[in-house]
Amino acid sequence: MPQNPSDRRPAPRDNPGTNAYEPLLSAEVRAALSTGLPVVALESTIIAHGLPRPRNLSVARELEGLVRSAGAVPATVAVLDGRARIGLDGDQLERVAGDPAVRKLGHRDLAPALAAGADGATTVSATAFLAARAGIGVFATGGLGGVHREWAENQDESADLRLLARTGITVVCAGVKSILDVPATLQRLETLGVPVVGYGTGHFPGFYLSSSGEPVDWTVHSPEEVAEVIRAREALGGPVGALIVANPVAERDQLDPVLHDRVLAQALDACRERGISGQGVTPFLLDQLTRRTEGASLEANLAAVRGNVTLAARIAVAAADAR
């Protein structure tokens, strides 16, 4: 009987030592960091698991191109052959985009994946951890994980939140997906001491939507202002943690709010009718949102990611110039 691809055993390592598990930086990323050039980390889960093939590869290349156009160096993060890689070449990017056996890796999965010689695409928690460890100060993603609906019954919360509370990196995102419990997520970030600033907005974005309706305490209006916040945090010292820059998708690119609210209400009703609960809720809601909006939610997702990547690169450039 054929094996599950995720169960395949890799060839044993030759004399594996501590260095065998050190993240491997591409020559371009290493040179940029050593000379103080701006670098932006990018996650790979959106490439391997978030988009249909072959569009995922073209989007991956597009996002790296947006970083370069803004004057920074892209560092897409992934695990290949049991080695964390920060900065991928063209062949490696194609491998992540084209191999269905590439696993989804959060921070907790990194050590087992490295030891097993596995291939994996990194989520927000894994990417933020590896990027910060390499000395990269800015990371762009679509949206953060957060507190899930029905938290009181199942205590389902993304690992992103705790990891960001102890990882020194600036994360540019479009908030959290509106299928999550947005007020509870913001409360959790406050409890964990993670600052959130709205970029050009007084409200926390709703990922597919420009606004979730929830206010933010601080607003910045330029990459230079964000760079100044980064400098102030570094000068203050104290506990290490992330800075969240919440960048709303442009109103012209957001999912139609009326359509969003109607589809989400229908999907929540379907959840209750089918008895779906716990960890099954979020994947079900995401699938329903994609299907019932006929792909419009995916386009809003991509618009948000593009905006975040461009802004992250501009912030990285401003932070490098301020040093």
From Swiss-Prot:
Q: What does the cofactor field's note say? A: Binds 1 Mn(2+) ion per subunit.
Return the GO cellular component terms, semicolon-separated: cytoplasm
Q: Please give the biological process terms from Gene Ontology that the record holds.
A: nucleobase catabolic process
Superkingdom to which the source organism belongs: Bacteria
An annotated Gene Ontology molecular function: hydrolase activity, acting on glycosyl bonds
Catalytic reaction annotation: D-ribose 5-phosphate + uracil = psi-UMP + H2O
**What is the required cofactor set for this protein?**
Mn(2+)
InterPro entries assigned to the protein according to its UniProt record, in alphabetical order? Indigdn_synthA-like, PsuG
Q: What is its EC number?
A: 4.2.1.70
Q: Any idea which positions bind substrate?
A: K104, V124, S158, A159, D160
| Active-site residue numbers | E43 (proton donor), K177 (nucleophile)
Q: Does the keyword Transmembrane apply?
A: no
> Which protein family is it in?
Belongs to the pseudouridine-5'-phosphate glycosidase family.
The record's section on HAMAP family has:
PsiMP_glycosidase
| Protein function | Catalyzes the reversible cleavage of pseudouridine 5'-phosphate (PsiMP) to ribose 5-phosphate and uracil. Functions biologically in the cleavage direction, as part of a pseudouridine degradation pathway.
Please report the name of this protein according to its UniProt entry: Pseudouridine-5'-phosphate glycosidase
Supply the source organism for this entry.
Streptomyces griseus subsp. griseus (strain JCM 4626 / CBS 651.72 / NBRC 13350 / KCC S-0626 / ISP 5235)
